[in-house]
Amino acid sequence: MSNYWLNIYKPRGISSAQLVSIVKKILGKTKIGHAGTLDVEAEGILPFAVGEATKLIRLLIDARKTYIFTVKFGMQTNSGDCAGKVIATKDCVPSQEEAYAVCSKFIGSVTQIPPAFSALKVNGVRAYKLAREEKKVELKPRNITIYDLKCLNFDEKNATATYYTECSKGTYIRTLAEDLALSLQSLGFVIELRRTQVGIFKEENAIRIKSPDEITKNALEAKSIKIEAILDDILVLDATDSQAQQIKYGQKCLFNYEKDFRHLAKFAYREEFKGNTERSTTAYTLVREDASTGLTYKLPLEVEFGKMSIDLLWVRYKGTLLAIGSLNKSCFNSLRVFNLTQDFF
């Protein structure tokens, strides 16, 4: 198997790029990428894509992420973490009650200004390079979503609090920590940061590597995750021979909603089940029947007659991932086509 995912745990003290070099040295492959850079001082889940899985990295970058981080109150650093130098202090530390209560203020849609020490570009130059040269860095505010935020522990003696958060892509935990502290009339920076989950990838199943000598290629590949795994919650269509050929060669491909979409409600990575439809006067509501429990679940999708617009789904051919794309009035538009079948036709 040469196209797959690896659930790698990045240790603290090395860069994401250094970990890529380690994995490349073990596998002997050049087509490797990762989904979401972690700072040198951070640790945690860093999913790796190998081979054709690299075409799906964007989907994983867009996935929700969870973090556990510890904030030190009363000081601010220029980088937002312990790698930077202290630039301000304030003799004000929140109480335990305040550290817990502040969380509710940040749940939902939030506007963040990314930290100067970030990989974002300013006029073609990485922001962190400008920040290191002590040049002024102005970054535009970004809208992010905090789905969950709670305080796990408060240490009055050391003026620290540890938080858990589930957040959207583009969230900077260093900025979140600073904003939490400011909301508490204090200053703060991150002293520990751990990413515990990215989409389906969790830390309890992660592979921990610090050097190429710690694991063999065969042992690493034995822990691989199939390429379709991250498509678990995306609707899938099965293509016929002719439809697969059209998609493979970039031709226009139509799906008949009276026929093909009757079985649209399938999630390929889970145990297979048969989908059916409930027809109303204006739409089909796709239904999932769970044979193990006998329960029926209505999927959050209504297919309007003649429109059939779906932002994202994937197509498989003979059980193998063929393409991801969108549908517009029953016409499939490919975003990525995959070369996973040896003898295609």
Curated annotation (Swiss-Prot):
Q: EC number(s)? A: 5.4.99.25
Q: Name one GO biological process term.
A: tRNA pseudouridine synthesis
| Reaction equations catalysed | uridine(55) in tRNA = pseudouridine(55) in tRNA
One GO molecular function term of this record is:
tRNA pseudouridine(55) synthase activity
Which residues are annotated as active site? 39 (nucleophile)
Print the keywords alphabetically.
Answer: Isomerase, tRNA processing
Q: What CDD domains is this protein classified in?
A: PseudoU_synth_EcTruB
Listed InterPro entries: PsdUridine_synth_cat_dom_sf, PsdUridine_synth_N, RPE1, tRNA_psdUridine_synth_TruB, TruB_C
Instruction: Please give the superkingdom of this protein's source.
Output: Bacteria
Q: Per the UniProt record, which residue ranges are transmembrane? A: none
Q: Which Pfam families match?
A: TruB_C_2, TruB_N
Q: Which Gene3D superfamilies match?
A: Pseudouridine synthase
- Where is coiled-coil annotated? none
Family, according to the entry, reads as follows:
Belongs to the pseudouridine synthase TruB family. Type 1 subfamily.
Known function? Responsible for synthesis of pseudouridine from uracil-55 in the psi GC loop of transfer RNAs.
Q: What is this protein called?
A: tRNA pseudouridine synthase B
Q: Which organism is it from?
A: Rickettsia rickettsii (strain Sheila Smith)
Q: Which gene encodes it?
A: truB
